[in-house]
Amino acid sequence: AAIVPQVAYSPNTHHYYSNTNYMLLAQIIENVSGVTYKDYLQTNIFDPCEMTNSVLYTRDNKDELINPVKGYTGNYTECIDIYLNGAVGDKGIYSDINDMLKFDQALYDGKLLSDSSLILAFKEHNDQKNNGQNYGYGFRLAYDEVKGKIPFHTGWWKGFRTYFVRVPSKQQTIVVLSNIKRGPFFNVNDLVNLLP
């Protein structure tokens, strides 16, 4: 007999981040679109944004990485390539600062999402806050008394760390890319306070 886990909480009452859910979302995108997640990203995000230095890494396309960078642990040991590196949806997009800024500008210009979709992405979908933060659709949400809502996301995997922080009220963006996984994450509000 199948074991059915107990429900952790009712829908729309809490948020618990799960990389596995993003992997599931990538599979849903493939099933609905009829193309691979890699091709979907290329056609619907990278090409419209002219992101020429971005690619979704899979185990089958190591040669497509443009100017590949090695990731390191906190003691400067090179991270090894493991089988989970080919999982998609929760990680695996290789990009650079210029392409990240093109992606950001496309969000401001409406190239990727309609205004109503952006509102949903940047809207709190429950009352739960963790360390003063909430979660929208694919964006964590921090708050600043002067600059307002701060949509952002962090990422890390096997020696790499990323910060993508938006300040829509000022049309400002912070992108931090690192190839060493060392030390604590930056506080998003501290990063935002570096901006004028």
Name each region found by the language model.
Residues 21, 138, 173, 187-192:
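Glycine-centered structural positions embedded in regular secondary structure
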Residues 144-146, 181-196:
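Short, gly/Ser/Thr-rich active-site loops of penicillin-recognizing serine hydrolases
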Residues 160-161, 184:
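Short active-site-adjacent structural elements
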Residues 163-166, 170-180:
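Short, well-ordered beta-strand elements
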